[in-house]
């Protein structure tokens, strides 16, 4: 199978780039308009289409530019990509933002805005943190995942048992074991627990009093 030097060069050049670097793959600026993106894609597609390029890697390179164009030509996907720095449909690799976030920033959170921006900011409307209940709801109830679904599945559910001091159960409804977290006890329940402990101690003392004081007195009275 014959191919030209230029055909080999363009195919290998595309494949040498990170598969998530969509702007670099299409050779356009990050502020490129839709028409500029389409023009750049068509230019590359003509050179890489298997019918036009006989290099063994041309088909693979063609798929790469197709994916880049599919994301950048879609307003919603492009917006997500610009935020997380990777293919919004690929959940296997950590985002560039999350990876760089662990380096920290001067005077700021050691997370540096990577992981927090990706998850907490999208969940809590730009705030850096939220109540523990909100975080659990986010993790188990599809409550604002940056990919539109809970990481534990779209069918996750929450059930509460035993009132304020009971348990909140999170389950993905797929036959797996539920996740349980005890809710904070109310002040009234804490007081009740303390009273129960005192009563238990009094009962123990009463038993000892009967054994060592009352019973010997009864014995002396009966057999004296």
Swiss-Prot record:
Q: Where is the composition biased (Low complexity)?
A: 181-192
Record PROSITE patterns: DNAJ_1, DNAJ_2
Name the segments for region: Disordered: 84-107, 173-192
CDD domains, per the entry: DnaJ
The Gene Ontology biological process annotation of the record reads:
ERAD pathway
Domain J stretches? 18-87
GO MF terms, alphabetically ordered: ATPase activator activity
Alphabetical keyword list: Chaperone, Phosphoprotein
Q: Which domain of life is it from?
A: Eukaryota
What name does the UniProt record give this protein?
Protein HLJ1
Give the organism, scientific name: Saccharomyces cerevisiae (strain ATCC 204508 / S288c) (Baker's yeast)
């Amino acid at each position: 199978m014959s191919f030209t030097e230029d055909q080999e060069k363009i195919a290998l050049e595309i494949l040498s780039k990170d598969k998530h670097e969509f702007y670099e793959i299409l050779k356009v600026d990050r502020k490129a308009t839709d028409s500029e993106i389409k023009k750049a894609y068509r230019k590359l597609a003509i050179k890489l289409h298997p019918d036009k390029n006989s290099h063994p890697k041309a088909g693979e390179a063609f798929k790469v530019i197709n994916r880049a164009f599919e994301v950048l030509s879609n307003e919603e996907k492009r917006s997500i990509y610009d935020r997380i720095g990777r293919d919004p449909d690929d959940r296997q690799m950590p985002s560039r933002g999350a990876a760089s976030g662990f380096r920290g920033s001067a005077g700021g959170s050691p997370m540096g805005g990577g992981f927090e921006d990706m998850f907490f900011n999208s969940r809590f409307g730009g705030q850096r943190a939220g109540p523990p209940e909100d975080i659990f709801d986010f993790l188990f109830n599809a409550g604002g995942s940056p990919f539109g679904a809970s990481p534990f599945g779209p069918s996750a559910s929450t059930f509460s048992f035993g009132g304020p001091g009971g348990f909140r159960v999170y389950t993905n409804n797929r036959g797996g074991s539920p996740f349980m977290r005890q809710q904070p006890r109310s002040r009234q329940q804490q007081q009740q627990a303390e009273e129960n402990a005192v009563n238990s101690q009094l009962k123990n003392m009463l038993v000892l009093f009967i054994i060592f004081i009352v019973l010997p007195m009864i014995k002396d009275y009966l057999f004296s």
